[in-house]
């Protein structure tokens, strides 16, 4: 995985980078810096930076659960075994975030993954030199024809011109997974993606209507619905990537029900707890409110929806029960600060949230 600041990681979930192209060429990072992790994997030892996936897999059997590690095991199962020898490297999958270009500033995002956030906070990033970036691009483009899987994310990948060049160089039978806010379908990148048969759209959404437009700042709910209808006609696979946190503790369920009513299967939903920023963590909610959420989750689990949806519910329930030091006052202060900067009043949008907070603090 490559981020526009130059960091190279095994994948987006990895807890630490392998290196940075500002310091050494990509070829050196992928071979020399990766030897110890390759050795651990070959010897079937747990890799310290992979704990996020191990935690999700703990106590579960089979492959019907959410884990990037399991996803790539399935996705690259046809790769020759000798590829996985220590010291050997053969690029077969990429996750390249060329820039942080994005037209949204989602409340839980930040400058690293959104140029709109960078502009709002007036942050300038230290990025690789033009030559370092060119060398990296050439490495990816030169190996594009042998890739089996390509993950396009961002930022907003449908806005990145580099993705157009990459798509033009890919094998037509490659598997493409694209994580998008689905705000723009009138781009050349979108047109190029539509030409591929094996596309998996991972659409970011976790609530409805005016809550959607607050959380996904810069977005339009009606545009989202129109664009969802467009990709639904393509015959591609569609999943929904959802985060569960302070503001959508109840409305995430309404979002799931709404999308299911549009005909989407229970295996289309990947829901996880928001980890950062911490002030939006769902566990800040008063105990009585969390108990209500837990009851709702347990009720939905009891109906045995199966597939990734049930696994999501179980993960959400487990996360709520993990120890946490509450500070709802800080959460409110941060939301007030955000509202003032953006000229919005969250109290007019999340009325039940503020009502539950006020009630929870008095009992």
Segments (PLM) and residue ranges:
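Distinct, well-ordered alpha-helical segments
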Residues: 162-168, 187-193, 251-255
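Core AdoMet radical
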Residues: 91-101, 112-132, 145-160, 171-186, ...
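N-terminal cationic-hydrophobic initiation segments that often serve targeting/anchoring roles
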Residues: 141-144, 167, 171, 193-194, ...
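N-terminal pre-core extensions flanking Radical SAM catalytic domains
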Residues: 1-12, 16-19, 23-129, 141-144, ...
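Helicase-associated low-complexity regulatory tails and linkers flanking the ATPase motor
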Residues: 128-140, 166
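Non-transmembrane alpha-helical segments in soluble domains
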Residues: 27, 106, 164-168, 228-229, ...
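Residues that form generic nucleotide/phosphate-binding pockets
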Residues: 29, 139, 143, 192, ...
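Conserved C-terminal portion of the radical SAM core fold
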Residues: 177, 197-202, 222-362
